[in-house]
Amino acid sequence: RQMCIRDRTREAIFATAEKIGYKKRVIYPKIENVALLYFVDHEDELEDVFYHGVKDEIIKQAKKMNIQLSIYDRKDGMDHVPKDLSAFIAIGWLTRKEINALYKRCKRGVFIGTSPDEKLFDAVKPNMDSFVTQMVDYFVEKGHKRIGFIGGSDRNIDTGKPSMDIREWSFRQSAAYYGYLNEEYIFISERFTVDDGYRMGKELLKKEILPTALCVASDTLAVGVLQALNEGNIQIPEQVAVFSINDVNIAKYLSPPLTTIHIDIPCICETALDLLRNRVLYGGRVTKLVFVNGIPVFRKSC
């Protein structure tokens, strides 16, 4: 027996549902045998809470999307990863040898935070290039001309040796565009630790003339930089303004509270899982590289 509902009544029901925020429940088809490759070195995890946040969020969202995950980390090695995977999600840094071995096991995969071979696999990344460009643009609009950069290195997947990180590259391009690129104000370490930020902050203080603004590649580095500047009795932002990336929880409690670009980890993870579902359910030969933008959170450091 069918129930007849007038168009006006139906419209009223839909309007009320929309008003109270009702959302239709989505039934996701089950996807089994998906590997979560958490190939993050212990030192890297301590340096950048981004990785750990992504791992936790992927596990939470995968459960909601009916995706069955098995987790493997770097100490397990590629030999422990099954050869009959439906798909995989990779977080962290893999060598060329590991990437090739992974491709032989499974051709359906999504990398988060890196795109080691965009010809082979999908990837979702924070739009670091845009973040740094926004930072430089902001400082220039505020009248700064002596703009510095504090960051870390990337790694070459073929050699394992340090290579230029996209944030440094973007800073150099943006600063050069305005005619403000000064090598004396660029400080690079191999890693992104608080200690490295502190050390580079101390090196900065040795300069006879300080930059009036600093772009810092991550909040973790910025914690150390702020400590060094505070110990040097540098007034922030009056003498040196500081702008960073990540918006970790501690950022709002630093002295002064840190201006930073918020990275939307839930959005990144949802995008990655959507790519994975589409790849498993519908196939397709063209790989996708997705950049997720961030939102500046202005506090008292600039």
Segments from the language model and where they lie:
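Periplasmic-binding protein-like
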Residues: 35-36, 85-91, 148-151, 187, ...
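Flexible loop/turn connectors
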Residues: 200-302
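Alpha-helical recognition/docking segments in bacterial nutrient-uptake
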Residues: 31-137, 141, 205-206
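N-terminal helix-turn-helix DNA-binding module of bacterial transcription factors
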Residues: 2-30
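Alpha-helical structural signal in soluble globular domains
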Residues: 16, 57-61, 166-178, 224-232
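Hinge/beta->alpha junction and helix N-cap segments in small-molecule ligand-binding domains
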Residues: 41-49, 73-77, 124-134, 150-200, ...
